[in-house]
Amino acid sequence: MNIKEALNRIVAQLDLTTEEMQAVMREIMTGQCTDAQIGAFLMGMRMKSETIDEIVGAASVMRELAAPVVIDAERLVDTCGTGGDGMNIFNVSTAAAFVVAAAGGKVAKHGNRAVSGKSGSADLLEAAGVYLGLKPEQVARCVESVGVGFMFAPSHHGAMKHAIGPRRELGLRTIFNMLGPMTNPAGARHQVIGVFSQALCRPMAEVLQRLGSEHVLVVHAQDGLDEISLAAPTFVAELKDGKVSEYRIQPEDFAIKSQSLIGLTVDNAEQSLELIRDALGRRKTENGQKAADMIVLNAGAALYAADHASSLREGVQLAHDALHTGLAREKLEELVSLTAVFKQENEG
C-alpha cells in the first residue's frame, strides 16, 4: 500500500492493517512522500483515531530504522510523555529521571524539543548545559557512570527528518507523539509513559505488550495532565507479567497532599529549569516544594516500573528519600560535566 491509497482509506474512515501501516511508514520515513501528503495522513489518522494495529505497525518501522544505543544495564527504564496535553507544566518526567538515578536506577531518557508545548526534554537539558550531540556509545557511558543518558530523538531517528516540517507546521499532536515513547533507541523495556488522553492508556499498554515491553505504566490524570498529577486522580494502565491492569491513584495514597498546579506552569525551558533546580535542591519556594512532590510521584512510578520497588508505594518512598539527599541535583550536574567532555571529544 502507498500513501495515496492509505489516504483514500482514511478519508472513508477505514482502518489500516499492521502490514499496510508499515508500508506507508516506510514510504514516509524514506522520503518518498510530499509534505502535503504527510500532513494529510497525520491529520486523517488523528481524525479517524489510530488503532492498535496501526500504532504497532508504525512503531515497528521506527524501531527498525533507528540508530541503536547498546547499554549494558538490567532493568533500563525510560520516563517520557507523548506531550500534547496543552498544560505547559514543567518537565516532570525529565526531572524524575535524575531522582531515579539518585535511587540507583538506570535511565535511558528518550526525548525531543517541544512541538506543541513550551519546553521539551531536549530544550530543558540544553538550557541546563547538557550537550545533545552525543554518539550512541557516549549515551551508554552516561547511563553507566551517571545513571542517566539522554537520547536526542533526531540523532537516533534520522528518518524522522522527512516528517519534521509537516509536524511543525501542523503544531498539533499526531501519531508521532505516541510513537516517540515507544521507540526508545536503547530498547528500554521498563517505562512510565504519560499520554494526552485516558482513552489511550490501555491501547498504549497493549501496543507495548505486542512490542515486547516487560513492565510499563501508562498514565493520564483526570485534570488532563500527561503525568501522575499532584492535583487530581491519575488513571493507570499497567503492563506487568504479560497482562494489562487498570486502576486509579491519587497523591494521598502515598502520604502526599493534593495541591493545585498553580505555580507549576512554565513559558519556556529556562523557567522549567529554575523550578526543577529548586525542587531538586533546597526547595526554597512553595512552588519548589510542590514540584518536588510531583517529581517524587513520577520518579516513584519509574522505580516501580524498573522493578527497583515491589510496589508503587515503595517506589514513591524510595524516590522521596533519594530527592531529599540532594543527590538528584548532583546527577544533573554530573551529566552536564560528562557531556561537556564528550562535546570536546566530538568537536576536537
UniProtKB/Swiss-Prot annotation:
<comment type="subunit">
    <text>Homodimer.</text>
</comment>
<keyword id="KW-0028">Amino-acid biosynthesis</keyword>
<feature type="binding site">
    <location>
        <position position="227"/>
    </location>
    <ligand>
        <name>Mg(2+) 2</name>
    </ligand>
</feature>
<feature type="binding site">
    <location>
        <position position="81"/>
    </location>
    <ligand>
        <name>anthranilate 1</name>
    </ligand>
</feature>
<dbReference type="InterPro" id="IPR035902">
    <property type="entry name" value="Nuc_phospho_transferase"/>
</dbReference>
<keyword id="KW-0460">Magnesium</keyword>
<feature type="binding site">
    <location>
        <position position="81"/>
    </location>
    <ligand>
        <name>5-phospho-alpha-D-ribose 1-diphosphate</name>
    </ligand>
</feature>
<dbReference type="GO" id="GO:0005829">
    <property type="term" value="C:cytosol"/>
</dbReference>
<feature type="binding site">
    <location>
        <position position="227"/>
    </location>
    <ligand>
        <name>Mg(2+) 1</name>
    </ligand>
</feature>
<dbReference type="Pfam" id="PF00591">
    <property type="entry name" value="Glycos_transf_3"/>
</dbReference>
<feature type="binding site">
    <location>
        <begin position="91"/>
        <end position="94"/>
    </location>
    <ligand>
        <name>5-phospho-alpha-D-ribose 1-diphosphate</name>
    </ligand>
</feature>
<feature type="binding site">
    <location>
        <position position="93"/>
    </location>
    <ligand>
        <name>Mg(2+) 1</name>
    </ligand>
</feature>
<feature type="binding site">
    <location>
        <position position="121"/>
    </location>
    <ligand>
        <name>5-phospho-alpha-D-ribose 1-diphosphate</name>
    </ligand>
</feature>
<feature type="binding site">
    <location>
        <position position="112"/>
    </location>
    <ligand>
        <name>anthranilate 1</name>
    </ligand>
</feature>
<dbReference type="InterPro" id="IPR036320">
    <property type="entry name" value="Glycosyl_Trfase_fam3_N_dom_sf"/>
</dbReference>
<keyword id="KW-0808">Transferase</keyword>
<dbReference type="GO" id="GO:0000287">
    <property type="term" value="F:magnesium ion binding"/>
</dbReference>
<keyword id="KW-0057">Aromatic amino acid biosynthesis</keyword>
<keyword id="KW-0822">Tryptophan biosynthesis</keyword>
<dbReference type="InterPro" id="IPR000312">
    <property type="entry name" value="Glycosyl_Trfase_fam3"/>
</dbReference>
<dbReference type="GO" id="GO:0000162">
    <property type="term" value="P:L-tryptophan biosynthetic process"/>
</dbReference>
<protein>
    <recommendedName>
        <fullName>Anthranilate phosphoribosyltransferase</fullName>
        <ecNumber>2.4.2.18</ecNumber>
    </recommendedName>
</protein>
<keyword id="KW-0479">Metal-binding</keyword>
<dbReference type="GO" id="GO:0004048">
    <property type="term" value="F:anthranilate phosphoribosyltransferase activity"/>
</dbReference>
<comment type="function">
    <text>Catalyzes the transfer of the phosphoribosyl group of 5-phosphorylribose-1-pyrophosphate (PRPP) to anthranilate to yield N-(5'-phosphoribosyl)-anthranilate (PRA).</text>
</comment>
<comment type="pathway">
    <text>Amino-acid biosynthesis; L-tryptophan biosynthesis; L-tryptophan from chorismate: step 2/5.</text>
</comment>
<dbReference type="Pfam" id="PF02885">
    <property type="entry name" value="Glycos_trans_3N"/>
</dbReference>
<feature type="binding site">
    <location>
        <begin position="84"/>
        <end position="85"/>
    </location>
    <ligand>
        <name>5-phospho-alpha-D-ribose 1-diphosphate</name>
    </ligand>
</feature>
<comment type="similarity">
    <text>Belongs to the anthranilate phosphoribosyltransferase family.</text>
</comment>
<dbReference type="InterPro" id="IPR017459">
    <property type="entry name" value="Glycosyl_Trfase_fam3_N_dom"/>
</dbReference>
<feature type="binding site">
    <location>
        <position position="167"/>
    </location>
    <ligand>
        <name>anthranilate 2</name>
    </ligand>
</feature>
<keyword id="KW-0328">Glycosyltransferase</keyword>
<dbReference type="InterPro" id="IPR005940">
    <property type="entry name" value="Anthranilate_Pribosyl_Tfrase"/>
</dbReference>
<feature type="binding site">
    <location>
        <begin position="109"/>
        <end position="117"/>
    </location>
    <ligand>
        <name>5-phospho-alpha-D-ribose 1-diphosphate</name>
    </ligand>
</feature>
<feature type="binding site">
    <location>
        <position position="226"/>
    </location>
    <ligand>
        <name>Mg(2+) 2</name>
    </ligand>
</feature>
